[in-house]
Amino acid sequence: MDELKKLAGVTAAKYVKNGMIVGLGTGSTAYFFVEEIGRRVKEEGLQVVGVTTSNRTTEQARGLAIPLKSADDIDVIDVTVDGADEVDPDFNGIKGGGGALLMEKIVATPTKEYIWVVDESKLVETLGAFKLPVEVVRYGSERLFRVFKSKGYCPSFRETEGDRFITDMGNYIIDLDLKKIEDPKQLANELDHTVGVVEHGLFNGMVNKVIVAGKNGLDILEK
């Protein structure tokens, strides 16, 4: 599957042209996209400026000598390539399994062409089997946890090595085990209006193109 993920990442990189501002995604498939951009910068003289979606991707891009700018310094991104944890037929998705959902959404929002690279296991009829990440400020997070629990959202604080996971922005993540999300837009609206929630992993209708790596090769889905 890694070879197919690599092929998907390399294929996505073909949408990147000279002079573009490029959003550099985070995750196992987006990794190969960033590697291919680095190769083209070195071997082909590709001239681009990258905007990263996590500290991990920043380190990777710097190691490849890809010129970078902060999201604060740009108004429009030409193309962003990132991964996703689930994608439904309406191009709604769940992201944030790697904990970078806030930065990923900040980069995705001003992007003209937003592309996801995924393996075929990420294609689902209904979102929700993958736990929905909700990034929350630390202050009041226990109360927010109880609110989610009272709604039957089966929350859990994300942990790493026995301690609470802390995002690149210094927040906690509460994962919601919803099993099935019948109305992603309604849930997104609810979370958007919940005090203490910084961001959530529902990316509804944002993506333009999904490059799928499967056992039979690549499939490119478009709106």
Swiss-Prot record:
Its EC number is 5.3.1.6. Substrate binds at residues 26-29, 82-85, 95-98, 122. Pathway: Carbohydrate degradation; pentose phosphate pathway; D-ribose 5-phosphate from D-ribulose 5-phosphate (non-oxidative stage): step 1/1. Keywords: Isomerase. InterPro entries: NagB/RpiA_transferase-like, Ribose-5P_isomerase, Ribose5P_isomerase_typA_subgr, Ribose5P_isomerase_type_A. The active site is at 104 (proton acceptor). One of its GO terms (molecular function) is ribose-5-phosphate isomerase activity. It is an enzyme of class 5 (isomerase). It catalyses: aldehydo-D-ribose 5-phosphate = D-ribulose 5-phosphate. SUPFAM superfamilies: D-ribose-5-phosphate isomerase (RpiA), lid domain, NagB/RpiA/CoA transferase-like. GO terms for biological process: pentose-phosphate shunt, non-oxidative branch. The keyword Isomerase applies. Homodimer. Belongs to the ribose 5-phosphate isomerase family. Catalyzes the reversible conversion of ribose-5-phosphate to ribulose 5-phosphate. This is Ribose-5-phosphate isomerase A. The lineage of its organism: Bacteria, Bacillati, Bacillota, Bacilli, Lactobacillales.
